Amino acid sequence: MNNPFTLSFGKKPLQYISRISQTNQILETFRSAVPSNQIFMITGVRGSGKTVLMTSIANELKQDDSWIVIELNPTRDLLQSLAAKIYGLPDMHSRFLNARLDFSAFGLGVSVENAAPVTDIENVLELMLEQIKKSGKRLLVTVDEVTPSEYIRIFASSFQIFLRQDQPIFLLMTGLYENIYDLQNDRSLTFLYRAPKLLLEPLSYFSVRNHYQKFFDIDTKTAGKMTDLTKGYPFAFQVLGYLYWENRRCH
């Protein structure tokens, strides 16, 4: 059996202590017939499990045919990237062609005869989102480790417009507290103040201890010492579990 723990940041490992409360809160809100929020911001210190939580939620919704899930790179032009990824979806691509939408100005497809090309990227996404709405689907966009960069600010401003248009777009972002704080302090992005923020606290001492004790079949005292070393950080839980597994024959 391969090591069930991982040293990779953000990758969901085989041995994983889930944050059931936060996961259910986001999933139930997004899946609601009339969602009270279409954005969640997950924050916490490095190693607190932000990316793993976001990935877990994204993977859950990927299994639902009524959802489209797209991950964006925060260091690139997010609007352009989102449009390109939506256009690359076979179901959506055919819908755009049937609706005679010409996105060739952005390198998306070819010119459509007797159709005026759309020349504004925000307008491109509005038209795409309208087609997603007509298909009965919802779109989840995930962005990991956001910073108050120009690309992020522009994307957040456009997202605010999409919300006012009642578009079926949802946003899940992770970031260090100071970056989230700086982003929401932008005068044009004050709506982010109202966006729910989940601050990931350390894992429960008893959850970590019990997990180690049961998985490694060790006594409570040994499991407790291991738990103390993790300080409740999910990544530390992974690292210690990984090392214990690799050296289990020595114990």
Features from the language model and the residues they span:
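Residue-level preference for the first positions of well-ordered beta-strands
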Residues: 37-41, 68-69, 138-140, 170
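Conserved catalytic segments around the Walker B and adjacent sensor/switch elements
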Residues: 41, 55, 59-77
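Conserved Walker B catalytic segment
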Residues: 114-178, 185-186
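Walker A/P-loop nucleotide-binding motif
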Residues: 36-56
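Conserved NTP-binding/hydrolysis module of P-loop NTPases
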Residues: 77-108
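Amphipathic alpha-helical "lid/sensor" segments that cap RecA-like P-loop NTPase cores
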Residues: 217-251
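A short, basic N-terminal segment
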Residues: 1-40
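Conserved small helical "lid"/interfacial subdomain of P-loop NTPases
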Residues: 195-223, 229
